C-alpha cells in the first residue's frame, strides 16, 4: 500500500489515496501505522476517497483507531494532495473578507458535511497554504454534545481530578472544551488531558485545549486530542479556541493561534458566522506499507 506522510504545523497523518489503493481495516491500520516506535509514526490515518457529492471525501482515523468527524490540519493536507496529484478539477476562487483571495478552491466531503477550501498556490503550482471554511460553530450543548445546561456553555464550572475548572464548549466539526489559563506551560496536560477527554459530561469524549491569551489578536494554546493525546497542533481546536475567546471577550474575531508546531490564522467572520482557518500544508515523504 502506497502512502504519503504529510503535516500541518506538526499535526501529522499518514494519507492514503483510495482512488488507487484499497484499505479494508482502516481502524486497525491506523493503530499500527500511528505507533511512533513500531509503525510509521503519526497522529492518525486519513483516507482520500471518491465522493458522490463533492470533489473528494476524507475519512479520519485517530491513533487509537476511533474515527473522527473532522480535522482542520488534515483537510488542508488533503486539499494539497488532491490539487497536486490532480484527483479533481479545482473550482473558482474563494474570497474571505480581510484575507487574500484564494485563486482556486475544492469541495471536500467530511464527517461534518461538505467543506470548501481555498488554495494559495505559488509560482511553481504548489499549494503553500490552504484556507478552510470550517462552517458555523455549534454552541448548543446537546449538539456539541455536552451534558451541561443552558443555551451555551460559556465558562461553566466542571469538576476535574478533585478541582474545578471553567470550560467553554464549542463544536467546529468535532467537540472541544476550552480552558483559559495564565500559563499553558504550567498545565500538566499528560495528567489532566485524559481526565477531560473521558469525563462523564462528554458522551462522545472531547478534545481539550488550554489557552493563554497574549493580547486581543493572538493566543497560545496546547491541545489534548480525543483519541490521539498530546499533539503539536489542532486546527479545528484552534477554531474552537478563537470562538471561545470571542465569546468571553478576550480576543478579536480575527486572530492568530500560536501552537507548538506553528501558527494558524483564524477568522470568525461576522458576515456569514463561519470560522475560516488558514495555515500551511507540507508533504514529508512517500512510502510503501507492506501488505501483511
Predicted regions and their residues:
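A glycine-rich beta-to-alpha transition motif near the start of alpha/beta enzyme domains, typified by
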Residues: 1-126, 177-292
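N-terminal, positively charged, Ser/Thr/Ala/Gly-biased leader segments
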Residues: 1-22, 132, 144, 149-170
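Short, solvent-exposed secondary-structure boundary/capping segments
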Residues: 125-134
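Ligand-binding beta-strand-loop-alpha-helix segment within the catalytic cores
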Residues: 138
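Extended Gly/Ser/Thr-rich low-complexity repeat segments
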Residues: 141-150, 286-291
